[in-house]
Amino acid sequence: MAAVSPTTRCQESVTFEDVAVVFTDEEWSRLVPIQRDLYKEVMLENYNSIVSLGLPVPQPDVIFQLKRGDKPWMVDLHGSEEREWPESVSLDWETKPEIHDASDKKSEGSLRECLGRQSPLCPKFEVHTPNGRMGTEKQSPSGETRKKSLSRDKGLRRRSALSREILTKERHQECSDCGKTFFDHSSLTRHQRTHTGEKPYDCRECGKAFSHRSSLSRHLMSHTGESPYECSVCSKAFFDRSSLTVHQRIHTGEKPFQCNECGKAFFDRSSLTRHQRIHTGESPYECHQCGKAFSQKSILTRHQLIHTGRKPYECNECGKAFYGVSSLNRHQKAHAGDPRYQCNECGKAFFDRSSLTQHQKIHTGDKPYECSECGKAFSQRCRLTRHQRVHTGEKPFECTVCGKVFSSKSSVIQHQRRYAKQGID
């Protein structure tokens, strides 16, 4: 038997349109958000499976739509036209008329289940039959033409049934680090990058790396300046529809994501996930310099600036620099005018609500932050952090003049004033 070249084997694969999921308007409206998210995962995974076969597949419009956060394509089931397919199209890499072991490749069973549709948004890629001929007919040895006609109507109903089966199947892929479960291995792989810190998708413009391809796609729009999704209330524009949806909840006040522990609600799922780490004590983001761990990646990023000494956020009014944008915002309110937030107990005013909240703990005596070593309690987390350095011996603040180290920032500032009085820079 003659060897089959990789090119020939590639030609025997199915097209993307064969595995695309199609819903009608009515079917789509019945799906809840988590099912719609799964739909996107299934579509993107099927597309990536076709691409992984080595075929020169152009990116269909529906995939482009999904990456931008648009609704998927939907078609009307009425007036569907007939479409003819060969009775046996090989989905395997070998030149065999059929797949003998359906359990061999799970994706192959799904692909075969999806035959019989055509989408106006998916360009038609060429399908080759096992005998190498291209088209919708397969000649039998006697020369008879055998055809299998499936209406798109039937194909869509078949696909919809399969989609609902996928949407209701159990999650069987479990993360060994945190125990979270997923429907498929690719979703698990993407999730595990949050633990490993892997970022395989690099931006060619600025070099910034991302853990997900969709995040890179959204980021690329920042270079092009394209912000196609505009808020109808305040006209603020966004790169993708999902960001616009989250933003609009600020105007509506909708907070659909609620914490089961304390009942606090949030605008988006990621904020809820970060919040829940307060209850679980999970701190997955560790500093490689000092080993300190944090519950949020943004807090780790700000912390690492302490080691580098870089303060990227500078006040345009006075030139003072800060580690975080929130600190800069609080500072700039001092330039803007009178403080807005006043304490009802003593009348002291503050520029932001968080500072007022911290201050009010003085009156209430609330000290929620307790040292695990000695039991001493504090009204502010930062004071607990400074106190814990007494036990650990950590001194992260270094004098740039003499190299002496200190456990608190205020101590190094006080120390450096001595040099300022002596005229030493």
From Swiss-Prot:
Main location: nucleus
Comp. bias regions, Basic and acidic residues: 93-110, 144-154
GO CC term, one of those recorded: nucleus
UniProt cross-references to InterPro entries, sorted A to Z: KRAB, KRAB_dom_sf, Znf_C2H2-type, Znf_C2H2_sf, Znf_C2H2_type
Domain spans labelled KRAB: 14-85
Disordered: region residues: 86-110, 122-163
Keyword Transcription in annotation: yes
Annotated keywords: DNA-binding, Metal-binding, Nucleus, Repeat, Transcription, Transcription regulation, Zinc, Zinc-finger
Any one biological process term the GO annotation gives: regulation of DNA-templated transcription
Keyword NAD assigned: no
Localization per record: Nucleus
Zinc finger (C2H2-type): 173-195, 201-223, 229-251, 257-279, 285-307, 313-335, 341-363, 369-391, 397-419
Gene Ontology MF terms in the entry: DNA binding; zinc ion binding
Family according to the record: Belongs to the krueppel C2H2-type zinc-finger protein family.
Protein function: May be involved in transcriptional regulation.
Protein name, as recorded: Zinc finger protein 2
Organism: Homo sapiens (Human)
Taxonomic placement: Eukaryota, Metazoa, Chordata, Craniata, Vertebrata
